[in-house]
């Protein structure tokens, strides 16, 4: 099948650039291996089943939290862990057969051995469980503690999956043999689709950039390898890319919901946090509307506008919109694994913040007491560190962002040894992958104050944050003083990636730091959702006028 990737201004073929008004595309080609789409589905099912067994070692089989339906924890954990394990297994085996065995079709061996190995492992585990228990169940306890809430959650995640699937296919789909790519994403999709096809229709081992980017590969590419492998197994490229993208983003949002439910104890906060995830705060729209009301052309401008609204540097790129998750599909998978780590290490944080000491004495004991350092679950820390480290070439920014938040958790937690072990193992696996895939240094960290703010002073940064996010970040800084110790520790930790973005530069392009701000934004929506729900509901003893004012503030 000959495909053409269509978007806006140019049309690329394999060998030349052809001017084509209104379109830009990359010709795509299929290899000789034509599998059945069922093989790709079997691959994903095997990954999920393998991940289900492996993730039990992380989440604790037989453990339950009252009132929380842990199925929404286990499903994304199974997807993330299983996909990591099986995909790395297939990649390593394929690499060996290509580089050492000089095989022309290394993915054939990688998939046969990897998928067969996963199936054998599942069969052996099933037999072992049957002999031990007399029956086989995927989970040993009921993962649906609250049946009434479960029905609402099924509806919530069903609608969420439909919406995300629609958005994924809206910007990337095949029609009449032509592969279409959306206007706001085609720039990134060009190298991404090339990387996918370098595996599905080529032999890109050792892996390098398809577009003559050098002998090594400094960019995280494993998500593209997964998509390319699914296409190799017979899935159409748009189905492969969109299915794994949808599963990753829905899985991340399931964990974000679970995290919100655990922090606040309210389902409404979890639902509203997901809503706020898609609709960010900001002052750009209000400024835009006011300017065009004054000019008298607001309606016409809104009808004709095709660009992102923004007044801060590069905001018109869509740096702060949901478009980021459509453009950078691999970010959601990395955040899925990072959020899993945060959810698990909440146990450590809650233990640390539950002590009765107050003020300086409490902080002192978190640093100098035995409980502050004594390991609570070393095995879990080792495993989570390994899985997080294996994500480095899926999405490095998500790994760094997750470690930054966990660093904040560690300050206020008991069991700091476990944090150190987890971070050390994660950094080791990241370093190991960098040594294998990268010639030279992957990053060159340096102090760079102010991010994209034109005025790099503290007042200038505050002004930038206000125009970029409205009261979102600045309001939380004030809100933290009215919280209890546990919530205050969580909120401060969620701010660590934002602080990092305004202080350090990891790559030559400072714009890349926007991902760390987006990571913080995703988690901090929990606290704004909590504030809005609390204002809307009001407190016992409030007058009708006070409750009405609270509802008005919640809407605003």
Language-model segments: what does each one mean?
Residues 8, 12, 29-147:
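Membrane-embedded, hydrophobic transmembrane alpha-helices
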Residues 137, 145-151, 351-379, 413-421, ...:
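Membrane-interface helix-loop-helix junctions at transmembrane boundaries of multi-pass membrane enzymes
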Residues 147-151, 160-337, 356-357:
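Active-site lumenal/periplasmic loops and adjacent helix-entry segments of GT-C-fold
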Residues 187-195, 201, 412-486:
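Transmembrane-lumen/periplasm boundary regions of multi-pass, lipid-linked membrane glycan transferases
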Residues 246-249, 331, 400-403, 510-537:
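Hydrophobic/aromatic-rich transmembrane helices and adjacent perimembrane loops
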Residues 322-327, 366-373, 380-395, 407:
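Membrane-interface alpha helices of multi-pass inner-membrane proteins
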Residues 340-351, 401-411, 425, 467-488, ...:
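Hydrophobic, aromatic-rich transmembrane alpha-helices
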Residues 422-431, 534-556:
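Signature aromatic-anchored transmembrane alpha helix within multi-pass, membrane-resident enzymes
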């Amino acid at each position: 099948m000959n495909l053409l990737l269509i978007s806006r201004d140019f049309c690329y073929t394999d060998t030349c650039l052809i001017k084509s008004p209104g379109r830009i595309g990359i010709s795509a080609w299929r290899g000789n291996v034509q599998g059945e789409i069922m093989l790709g589905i079997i691959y994903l099912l095997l990954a999920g089943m393998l991940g289900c067994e492996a993730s039990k070692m992380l989440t604790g089989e037989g453990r339950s939290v009252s009132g929380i339906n842990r199925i929404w924890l286990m499903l994304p954990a199974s997807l993330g862990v299983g996909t990591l394990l099986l995909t790395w297994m297939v990649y390593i085996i394929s690499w060996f057969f290509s580089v050492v065995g000089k095989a022309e079709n290394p993915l054939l061996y990688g998939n046969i051995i990897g998928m067969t190995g996963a199936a054998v492992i599942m069969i052996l585990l099933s037999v072992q469980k049957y002999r031990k228990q007399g029956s086989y169940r995927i989970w040993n306890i009921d993962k649906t503690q609250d049946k009434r809430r479960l029905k609402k959650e099924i509806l919530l995640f069903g609608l969420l999956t439909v919406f995300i699937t629609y958005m994924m296919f809206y910007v990337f789909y095949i029609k009449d043999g032509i592969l279409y790519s959306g206007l706001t994403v085609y720039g990134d999709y060009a190298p991404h689709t090339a990387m996918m096809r370098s595996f599905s229709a080529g032999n890109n081992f050792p892996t390098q950039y398809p577009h003559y980017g050098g002998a090594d590969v400094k960019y995280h590419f494993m998500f593209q390898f997964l998509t390319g492998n699914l296409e190799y197994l017979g899935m159409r490229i748009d189905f492969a890319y969109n299915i794994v993208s949808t599963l990753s983003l829905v899985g991340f949002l399931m964990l974000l919901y679970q995290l919100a439910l655990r922090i606040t104890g309210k389902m409404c906060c979890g639902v509203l946090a997901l809503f706020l995830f898609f609709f960010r705060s900001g002052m750009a729209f209000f400024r835009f509307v006011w300017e065009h009301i004054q000019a008298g052309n607001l309606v016409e401008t809104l009808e004709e506008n095709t660009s992102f609204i923004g007044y801060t540097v590069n905001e018109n790129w869509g740096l702060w919109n949901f478009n980021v998750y459509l453009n950078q599909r691999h970010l959601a998978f990395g955040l899925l694994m990072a959020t899993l780590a945060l959810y698990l290490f909440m146990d450590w944080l809650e233990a640390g913040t539950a002590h009765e000491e107050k003020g300086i004495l409490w902080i002192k004991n978190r640093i100098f007491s035995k409980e502050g350092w004594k390991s609570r679950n070393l095995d879990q820390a080792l495993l989570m560190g390994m899985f997080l480290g294996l994500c480095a070439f899926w999405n490095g920014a998500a790994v760094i962002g997750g470690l930054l938040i966990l660093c904040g958790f560690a300050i206020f937690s008991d069991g700091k040894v476990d944090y150190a072990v987890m971070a050390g193992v994660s950094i080791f696996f990241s370093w190991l992958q960098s040594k294998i895939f990268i010639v030279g240094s992957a990053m060159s960290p340096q102090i760079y104050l102010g991010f994209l703010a034109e005025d790099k002073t503290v007042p200038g940064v505050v002004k930038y944050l206000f125009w970029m996010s409205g009261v979102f970040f600045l309001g939380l800084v004030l809100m933290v003083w009215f919280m209890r110790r546990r919530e205050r520790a969580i909120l401060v930790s969620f701010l660590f990636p934002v602080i990092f973005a305004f202080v350090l530069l990891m790559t030559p392009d400072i714009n890349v730091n926007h991902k760390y701000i987006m990571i913080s934004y995703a988690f901090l929506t929990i606290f704004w959702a909590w504030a809005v729900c609390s204002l809307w509901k009001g407190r016992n003893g409030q007058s009708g006028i006070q409750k009405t004012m609270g509802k008005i503030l919640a809407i605003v």
